């Protein structure tokens, strides 16, 4: 009898512990900023259990965050606040251009569900604003002709390399950080995303400086690859999009895979050719909607740089459109080797290919584009100047 009582007590204790665990929630990763414009930005973070998510924010005039009450902006879709997610993304809209904001993130654990909409909610986790400064950001402005941004690509999961290479970088001087593809070799699970590169980015800059996210060919690989959009949603629902900053129209493009879709490496699940054709149709239409004559393209694979299928297909579909758009410069990666292709070699504009162990610091002032490519040795460092057409 005593034995059975002990078993029952253990089971009850386990049930109590489970209930307690369901009541609590922790923010385990993030936040990070993405998809910024002059009047909007998306805040994303991760919790350990399903929860609601919301952001409170305000203009930063040097006041304490809680000098006044702030509106809650929830992670919501189609009129319902999401409760079953562990990745939370909140789009802040109606912002002022070129304005400093501060923000705080919150999540409340989902502990159970009754009938209909009887969601039971537990404890709240949040970022700290009492003992340290709240997170902050500055929206893009098109009333200036100055811009500074930072480029990393082809990290392939080497988060330690990010930390080492960027250890002395003052990210507060940058308007955004461009991640130009192949941040992992293959995406098999969520933990790889965080441990391979995203945690390093959050620790170094992404809470306060927005990420411009562009996929490489390797972002198409792995059983978890189809989930990447949850971590980097965009305002048009695609991995290709445009945005404006400092009177420049940026065309952020998606390259697809580098080999034919029928290659045995893809096991019959790729449709990169059809996808690129859809992207080209979008681009042809989008060119007429660009707001500014200064134009920069971003594409992981430097179209036409090799005789691989992806390069050729991109070149045939995209390059002519970019020429017609009057692009002045394109930033690429993929080859793992720094190179500059002059105007007339691959396109009517120059193409700067950043290596896999260097970063590029880009400063725009008026019609001038100055680029510093920095590596761990002097031999890897380069200084270049370009001009808008």
Language-model features: locations:
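Conserved, compact domain cores that house catalytic/ligand-binding motifs in diverse enzymes
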Residues: 145-223
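Active-site environment of divalent metal-dependent phosphoester hydrolases
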Residues: 157-162, 185-188, 215-224, 258-262, ...
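Active-site-proximal segments of metal-dependent phosphoesterases and phosphodiesterases across multiple
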Residues: 266-267, 272, 288-330
């Amino acid at each position: 009898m005593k034995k059975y009582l002990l078993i029952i007590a253990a089971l009850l204790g386990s049930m109590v512990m489970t209930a307690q665990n369901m009541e609590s929630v922790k923010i385990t990763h993030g936040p990070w900023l993405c998809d910024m414009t002059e009047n909007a930005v998306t805040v994303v973070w991760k919790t350990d259990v399903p929860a609601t998510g919301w952001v409170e924010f305000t203009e930063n005039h040097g006041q304490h965050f809680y000098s006044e009450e702030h509106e809650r902006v929830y992670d919501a879709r189609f009129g319902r606040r999401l409760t079953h997610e562990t990745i939370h993304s909140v789009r802040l809209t109606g912002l002022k251009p070129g304005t400093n904001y501060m923000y705080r993130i919150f999540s409340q654990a989902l502990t159970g569900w009754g009938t209909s909409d009887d969601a039971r909610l537990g404890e709240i986790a949040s970022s700290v604003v009492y003992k340290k400064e709240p997170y902050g950001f500055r929206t893009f402005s098109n009333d200036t002709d100055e811009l500074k941004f930072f480029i990393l690509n082809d990290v392939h999961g080497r988060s330690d390399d990010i930390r080492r290479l960027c250890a002395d970088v003052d990210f507060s001087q940058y308007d955004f950080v461009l991640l130009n593809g192949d941040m992992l070799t293959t995406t098999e699970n969520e933990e790889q995303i965080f441990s391979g590169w995203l945690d390093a980015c959050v620790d170094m800059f992404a809470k306060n400086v927005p990420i411009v996210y562009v996929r490489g060919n390797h972002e198409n690989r792995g059983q978890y690859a189809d989930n990447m959009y949850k971590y980097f949603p965009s305002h048009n629902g695609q991995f290709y999009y445009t945005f404006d900053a400092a009177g420049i129209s940026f065309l952020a493009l998606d390259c697809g895979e580098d080999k034919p879709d029928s290659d045995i490496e893809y096991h019959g699940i790729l449709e990169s050719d059809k996808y690129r054709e859809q992207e080209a149709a979008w681009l042809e239409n989008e060119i007429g909607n660009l707001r500014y004559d200064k134009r920069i393209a971003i594409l992981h694979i430097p179209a036409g740089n090799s005789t691989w299928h992806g390069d050729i297909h991109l070149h045939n579909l995209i390059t002519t459109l970019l020429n017609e758009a009057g692009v002045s410069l394109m930033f690429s990666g993929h080859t793992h080797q720094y190179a500059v292709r002059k105007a007339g070699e691959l396109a009517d504009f120059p193409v700067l290919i950043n290596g896999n162990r260097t970063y590029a610091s880009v400063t725009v002032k008026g019609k001038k584009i100055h680029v510093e490519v920095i590596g761990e040795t002097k031999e890897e460092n380069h200084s270049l100047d370009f001009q808008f057409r």
